[in-house]
């Protein structure tokens, strides 16, 4: 059986969404710092080996990229609020001055021989069984015993030049344009336009009946340009190491990918609302390739500049090529098995000679599919197949020939995590130790399967984005003379690229697009044109599908207006159909589908206490109902003992039950996932003998104008307009 399915509730009291397997490594172990005028790290009593690092050229090239790990940096809420009122540059000066008196002996360097064969290396962390491991950055920190298998400083300089041949700086490279060759005046103009919501937009069509909306900051003299399609990886500005491998795994792009790749690799924000089982692997490979390309270009830029500073130690070179901390890419995923798929893409594109702790990664992250799920839908098996635990985090560190799993966050290049996994380490339970500085220098944020995250606890995702690219509270060994100016000016969130992939778009995802995706390079949104889920009903006979519109003046008042319409209009009809003469109960087989758990609780309590429903027998199944109570409710409903069954959308998402005995369906609101419409309506045909009767009972769904996004997926793009604005009536039927 796979690990327990995470079900982080949508209600505030449910913080956890699954079982965490965080493991403790060496919390006191020291981390090397940037080379040159770096801020010294305060000495920790529990530091490994000798404590600090070598200075100057004694640093190996990989260490020059790394910021030290503070074992338990913390700040009170009052301090956090106070910091928000200070100017960013003054804050950085205080951090810089605070670390000047720190020091310690140099760390011993360890050189190890290596061969050219691809091997997996296991490096065990200390105290892995300690429960505090849940609160550590990665699920098990790398040990100082597993020092680098390769030191670039041990390579002759001509070998370094050979490795980087063909990778010289290209002024037309989007990496150079977006991060290095930044016009500070133009950047400020774009940020000012974004802050005042001054976007200019252009709409166009994409292959596959998709609609594209491209937006750019509205600055004088700049207009939106529709980028030409890219046919294959040969047309991308890739590091040579990646180009060689990418061509073997990603040949030519299909028409959809060709249209979107220029924006992705051009560092524009992307909200893609048409993720499917057929295109998910392709887009996963593409965003992994983009992330690796960014990591390698950032790393090589720092190494080349380090070499320049070593050759000209007395020069006044100003080489700004870094952020505050090392992590540059954040990938947010719903489950551990999704993390395994991403790592498979990264490994095949990077082709490392060594992978440290790979076996341990597969042991703790991967699992076999449950054989009992063979009858489940394909999208269910993709999401919940294997290890479906939604409490995880993983740091990845890249060297020239190695991928190191379970590296500490401040020592990592890429962080892969679930929203809950990050929330647990960012916001400690004791409330005294908060640490999110490792998110201060994220330059690419990727959210895959955003629709699945909605069914966990979307508030965790919002919390993570609210803490991206904030000014750090600690120096973490940062060399401020190498930090890019837009970091120092607190403008990093306007340079960060965000890529979001979802099967459909909801108001919550739209809010993320509007408020958190503020890239000065621009942003695009790709959405499908829907035919409508009402056309794809798995029944042999036509089913009457009725939609009832109620008036709602605002989203805030919508829950109250919906409940009032249900109790005054829908419920009276329900009671008449489910009771006989004299108020005696009569089995009606009515299923009430409820998208929101809060609405479910309200309706359940009303049916249990209202005099209007005193003769109405009902059962209830929610995502929090025990297996035993679920079985009892289903049995009573099928036998007719309960004439009504309440059933939530999140229950269906996590379980995909087949409810028998359904003769009529009332939808308190249409589902977010259009696939659920056909599956729930399909309950009417589970008993072949009563299919005709059930089809006549049909479906009645309630909606308001605030359900426009959901309704578009259910009834189709063309039908939606009239249903929202029709003056002649508020009931619409389809057969």
From Swiss-Prot:
Record InterPro entries: P-loop_NTPase, UTP25, UTP25_C, UTP25_NTPase-like
Keywords: Nucleus, Ribonucleoprotein, Ribosome biogenesis, rRNA processing
Source organism of this protein record: Paracoccidioides brasiliensis (strain Pb03)
Alphabetical list of Pfam families matching this protein: Utp25_C (PF06862), UTP25_NTPase-like (PF22916)
Keyword Nucleus included in the entry's annotation: yes
Extent of Acidic residues compositional bias: 59-69, 138-157
Residue ranges with Basic residues bias: 18-30
Single GO MF descriptor: U3 snoRNA binding
GO-annotated biological processes: maturation of SSU-rRNA from tricistronic rRNA transcript (SSU-rRNA, 5.8S rRNA, LSU-rRNA)
Keyword Ribonucleoprotein: yes
Protein purpose: DEAD-box RNA helicase-like protein required for pre-18S rRNA processing, specifically at sites A0, A1, and A2.
Family the UniProt entry places it in: Belongs to the UTP25 family.
Region described as Disordered: spans on this chain: 1-173
Subcellular location: Nucleus, Nucleolus
Record text on subunit structure and interactions: Component of the ribosomal small subunit (SSU) processome composed of at least 40 protein subunits and snoRNA U3.
Protein name: U3 small nucleolar RNA-associated protein 25
Any GO CC annotation of this UniProt entry: small-subunit processome
Compositional bias per record (Basic and acidic residues), positions renumbered to this chain: 38-47, 113-127
Gene name for this UniProt entry: UTP25
């Amino acid at each position: 059986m796979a690990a327990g399915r995470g079900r982080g509730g949508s209600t505030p009291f449910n913080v956890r969404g699954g079982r965490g397997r965080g493991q403790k490594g060496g919390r006191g172990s020291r981390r090397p710092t940037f080379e040159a005028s770096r801020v010294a790290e305060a000495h920790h009593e529990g530091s490994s080996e000798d404590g600090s690092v070598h200075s100057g050229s004694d640093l190996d090239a990989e260490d020059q990229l790394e910021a030290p790990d503070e074992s338990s940096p913390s700040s009170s809420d009052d301090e956090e609020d106070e910091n928000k009122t200070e100017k960013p540059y003054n804050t950085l000066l205080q951090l810089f001055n605070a670390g000047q008196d720190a020091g310690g002996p140099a760390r011993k360097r360890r050189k190890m021989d290596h061969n050219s064969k691809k091997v997996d290396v296991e490096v065990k962390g200390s105290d892995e069984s300690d429960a505090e491991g849940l609160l550590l950055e990665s699920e098990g920190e790398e040990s100082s015993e597993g020092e680098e298998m390769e030191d670039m400083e041990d390579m002759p300089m001509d070998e370094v030049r050979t490795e980087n041949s063909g990778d010289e700086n290209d002024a037309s490279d989007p990496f150079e344009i977006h991060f290095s060759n930044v016009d500070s005046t133009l950047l400020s103009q774009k940020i000012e336009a974004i802050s005042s919501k001054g976007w200019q937009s252009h709409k166009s069509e994409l292959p596959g009946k998709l609609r594209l909306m491209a937006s750019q900051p509205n600055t004088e003299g700049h207009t939106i340009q529709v980028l030409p399609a890219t046919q294959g990886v040969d047309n991308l500005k890739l590091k040579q190491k990646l180009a060689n491998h990418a061509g073997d795994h990603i040949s030519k792009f299909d028409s959809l990918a060709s249209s979107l790749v220029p924006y992705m690799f051009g560092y524009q924000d992307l909200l893609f609302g048409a993720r499917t089982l057929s295109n998910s692997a392709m887009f996963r490979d593409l965003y992994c390739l983009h992330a690796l390309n960014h990591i390698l270009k950032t790393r090589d830029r720092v190494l080349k500049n380090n070499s320049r500073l070593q050759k000209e130690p007395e020069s006044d070179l100003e080489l700004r090529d870094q952020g505050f901390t090392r992590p540059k890419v954040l990938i947010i995923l719903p489950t551990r098995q999704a993390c395994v798929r991403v790592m498979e893409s990264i490994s095949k594109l990077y082709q490392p000679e060594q992978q440290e702790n790979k076996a341990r990664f597969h042991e703790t992250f991967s699992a076999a599919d449950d054989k009992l799920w063979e009858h489940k839908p394909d999208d269910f098996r993709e999401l919940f197949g294997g290890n479906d635990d939604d409490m995880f985090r993983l740091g990845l560190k890249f060297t020239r020939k190695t991928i190191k799993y379970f590296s500490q966050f401040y020592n990592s290049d890429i962080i892969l995590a679930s929203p809950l996994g990050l929330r647990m380490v960012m916001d400690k339970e004791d409330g005294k130790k908060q640490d999110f500085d490792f998110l201060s220098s994220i330059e690419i944020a990727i959210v895959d399967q955003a629709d699945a995250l909605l069914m966990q606890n979307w508030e965790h995702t919002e919390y993570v984005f609210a803490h991206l690219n904030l000014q750090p509270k600690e120096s973490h060994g940062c060399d401020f003379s190498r930090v890019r100016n837009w970091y120092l000016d607190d403008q990093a969130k306007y340079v960060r690229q965000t890529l979001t992939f979802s099967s459909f778009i909801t108001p919550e995802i739209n809010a993320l697009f509007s408020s958190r995706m503020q890239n000065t390079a621009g942003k695009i949104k790709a959405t499908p044109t829907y035919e409508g889920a009402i056309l794809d009903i798995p029944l042999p006979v036509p089913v009457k599908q009725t939609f009832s519109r109620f008036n709602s003046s605002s989203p805030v008042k919508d829950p109250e207006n919906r409940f009032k319409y249900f109790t005054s209009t829908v419920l009276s009809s329900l009671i008449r159909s489910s009771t006989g003469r004299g108020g005696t109960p009569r089995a009606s087989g009515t299923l009430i589908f409820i998208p929101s758990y809060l609405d479910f609780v309200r309706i359940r309590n009303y049916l249990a206490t209202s005099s209007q429903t005193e003769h109405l027998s009902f059962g209830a199944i929610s995502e929090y109902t025990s297996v035993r109570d679920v079985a009892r409710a289903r049995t009573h409903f099928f036998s007719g003992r309960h004439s009504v069954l309440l059933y939530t959308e999140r229950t269906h998402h996590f379980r995909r039950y087949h409810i028998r005995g359904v003769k009529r369906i009332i939808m308190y609101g249409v589902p977010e996932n259009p696939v659920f419409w056909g599956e729930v309506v399909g309950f009417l045909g589970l008993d072949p003998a009563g299919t005709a009767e059930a089809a006549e009972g049909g479906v009645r769904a309630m909606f308001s104008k605030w359900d426009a996004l959901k309704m578009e997926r259910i009834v189709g793009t063309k039908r939606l307009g009239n249903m929202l604005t029709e003056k002649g009536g508020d009931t619409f039927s389809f057969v």
